[in-house]
Amino acid sequence: MYFQHQFSSLNLNSFLPEGILIFNIIFILILDLVSQKENKSMLVKISFIGLLLSMLTLIQQWYHESTIAFLGSFEVNHFTTCFRLIISLCCILCIPLSFEYIKCSGIRLTEFIIFLLFTTLGAMILSSANDLITIFISLECLGLGSYLLTGYVKKDIRSNEAGMKYLIIGGTSSSIFAYGLSWLYGLSGGSIYLKSIAYSFSHLNPSYSLASWFAYICIIVGIGFKLSLVPFHRWSPDVYEGSPTPVVAFLSIISKAGALALTIRISDIIFPILEQDSNSILQILAILSMIVGNLLAMVETSMKRILTYSSIAQAGYLLIGIVAGRNNGYASLLVYMIFYLFMNIGAFSCIILFGLRTGTDQIRDYTGLYTKDPWLASCLSLCLLSLAGIPPLTGFFGKILLFWSAWQSGFYFLVMTGIFTSIVSIYYYIRIVKFLVVAKEKDISYYVKKYSTYKSNSLMKQNPIELNIYLCTFISGFVGIFMNPVIYFAQQSILK
């Protein structure tokens, strides 16, 4: 009876989406062991089915009340479920990109898919982790999978270098983060659960306020590296440039989603007593990230590096939602995160498709693409302009919601900085569009002149990347006009 009671108290149903992913990983491993030849299409179908089942379970959980699983180590509520949905959706959208990239590169898909699912699993657990040990282990799962994906193409020296850099920087940031967690553990008198630590902090002797500040700064520095916030961003352009492009698309979303969920939970549960001062730190990081990310993107010539610096600036915009605070602030962050997922993956899908057909990602090599492939050029332009926040595209409405929530909370300088940097970002996005639509024959690049494409009239025979582009471009371009259901979903995730 005692064992039965303990087992029922684990609430394993709450962990079912992650359990499906674990089963999926094990099944793919067993399938690879018993198969004589790698069946790439079968692997993609299996991973798709697992992720879709996981998403369906998450949608079902969203309609249920909050629960605590694994004796307090794992909390499931509407807010964490929303982030887990974003993470699993990101993985679903990145699998077609990976399949085509791996097929053209001639390397094994099995391990790549396993690392992709493993990283997704780490990010999902991180979003719902409720104690210090689970937080650190899930963060390391996310990090370890990221390092392996970054350096996956062993024959490419740039990929090897990127993987090694990421491993060293990631290990350093994890050490700083773990040091901050150890201070939380000590200051709380040996508690590992977030709410127990928060209770201890509410009764903390004022003489220990400096120590709690030190713990907070260590944690924010560790998370800052994961989010590529300025001044912790120096590693990301080099690492992302050397990584396989589908990995860059995947990590630019999934690391942000997991790290932002963790930041909100730690700031909201443990450090509400530091709310005003901690907001000052987050404001500074947001302002620096928006300014530096957009300014450095203006001088880049590689599409991957431009989108890397753009992702640094986007992390700054997303921080505005945390600074703005509960309800409206967090809801606007969730809405923009959903929109950013589709805008970013849509842009990367276009870059991957062009790269697979030409072998380049330099901006000037896109010159005149509209004359050869108007569909791809139009989709890429739409996704980039949406990232810039040009009305009436989806990105514009997402940014307006973020800025309005911060303005209502009184962060006027932060909002003005966000508006100014958004205007600056239009320059480098428009510059890319300008290259795409060049019509003069003499200006068309060598790669575009040699560019060839095949488009099937049948939807079922379309390239998987093209299907991705259809979906992401539609959402990036038009969903913002009808965004009320998305806002309702985000607000309900916060209010409940």
From Swiss-Prot:
Protein's gene: ndhB
Subunit structure, interactors included: NDH is composed of at least 16 different subunits, 5 of which are encoded in the nucleus.
Transmembrane feature ranges: 14-34, 42-62, 79-99, 109-129, 133-153, 167-187, 210-230, 244-264, 281-301, 305-325, 334-354, 377-397, 400-420, 469-489
GO biological-process terms attached to the record: ATP synthesis coupled electron transport; photosynthesis, light reaction
Name of the protein this chain belongs to: NAD(P)H-quinone oxidoreductase subunit 2, chloroplastic
Location in the cell: Plastid, Chloroplast thylakoid membrane
Primary localisation category: plastid
Known EC number: 7.1.1.-
Family: Belongs to the complex I subunit 2 family.
The entry's keywords: Chloroplast, Membrane, NAD, NADP, Plastid, Plastoquinone, Quinone, Thylakoid, Translocase, Transmembrane, Transmembrane helix, Transport
Organism: Chara vulgaris (Common stonewort)
A molecular function GO annotation: quinone binding
